[in-house]
Amino acid sequence: MDTVNKNRQLKEAKVAEIKEKLEKAQSVVLASYQGLTVEQDTNLRKSLREAGVEYKVYKNTLVTLAAKELGFDGIVEYLEGPVSIAFGYEDATAPARILNDFAKENKKLELKAAIVEGTVYNKEQTEQLAAIPSREVLLAKLLGSIKSPLSNFAYLLSAIADKKEESAE
């Protein structure tokens, strides 16, 4: 009986851990990893870690319990077979982008679904999410589009000032 209680406590602790990660993450991506070699899995984990993405494998039944408790019933249908979970805490698109890029090179990895800010997305929607650039890239593009007209305006003012100086001489 003591072993049964201990196992139950361990499972409850895992469910609590999964719930905490699901609540804390900006995005969560589920992927099927069946058939990946150890080397491929190691490379994938390294890429995800470098981007600040946590990559885990849990028992599907435990993830199901955690998801249902949080109201993410929509992901339960994707929890069949070997499923890995990538938790993105900083950049909401990073898990989908990295897993999708990896899946293009390694056909054994397949995106299944994602949760972004409480909304569940299917495989196709997750692939579309992967196409969105990172926040830093979007900010750089925005700043570039703001800076360009200002630079042109400054150049124009400089040219006018130079022309006035030439005509004054």
Swiss-Prot record:
Gene3D superfamilies for this protein: 3.30.70.1730, 6.10.250.290
Entry's Gene Ontology molecular function annotations: large ribosomal subunit rRNA binding
The keyword RNA-binding appears for this protein: yes
InterPro entries: Ribosomal_uL10 (IPR001790), Ribosomal_uL10-like_sf (IPR043141), Ribosomal_uL10_bac (IPR022973), Ribosomal_uL10_bac_type (IPR047865)
Top-level division of the source organism's lineage: Bacteria
GO biological process: translation
Keywords: Ribonucleoprotein, Ribosomal protein, RNA-binding, rRNA-binding
Annotated GO CC locations: ribonucleoprotein complex; ribosome
Subunit architecture: Part of the ribosomal stalk of the 50S ribosomal subunit. The N-terminus interacts with L11 and the large rRNA to form the base of the stalk. The C-terminus forms an elongated spine to which L12 dimers bind in a sequential fashion forming a multimeric L10(L12)X complex.
Family to which this protein belongs: Belongs to the universal ribosomal protein uL10 family.
Function: Forms part of the ribosomal stalk, playing a central role in the interaction of the ribosome with GTP-bound translation factors.
Protein name, per record: Large ribosomal subunit protein uL10
Organism from which the protein derives: Clostridium perfringens (strain 13 / Type A)
Gene: rplJ
